[in-house]
Amino acid sequence: MKKAFLTLLLITNLNLVFSQETNSAYDEKLAKSLNADERGMKQYVFCILKTGSNTTATAEEKNNLFKGHMDNITRLAKEGKLVLAGPFMKNDRNYRGIYIFNVATIEEAKALVATDPAVKANIFEVELTPWYGTAALQETLKIHEKITKK
């Protein structure tokens, strides 16, 4: 009985050892460059932009604010602080767009959204939430540049 138990224990332990295989496509250098954990993930801050309280801005003011908003997005992306940005389609929640910031804390993200003229002018309000996602998201902009004609 003792021999059967030890054999079963050995088989179970061997099964556990071999089930912990490393992904053969794993690129340690890339993972380190993206600050990926062992799952290929990292922490970001997710931001939802919602319609703000400023309903009195003129068309010209809005145009200037949106130009500044887009310029700010471009700057943050070039700095590596913003890995994803884009508008929502029309919806009943007053959601206008999203940002995913390549920072670890809400405080860092607050400092970044404070540089957006449309947020400063209350055209947009923001909700910030810590988010855990693929570290590969940081490569999205490089790919986007290759598929954008204009």
Question: What are these model-derived regions, one by one?
Answer:
Residues M1-T22:
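Bacterial Sec-dependent N-terminal signal peptides
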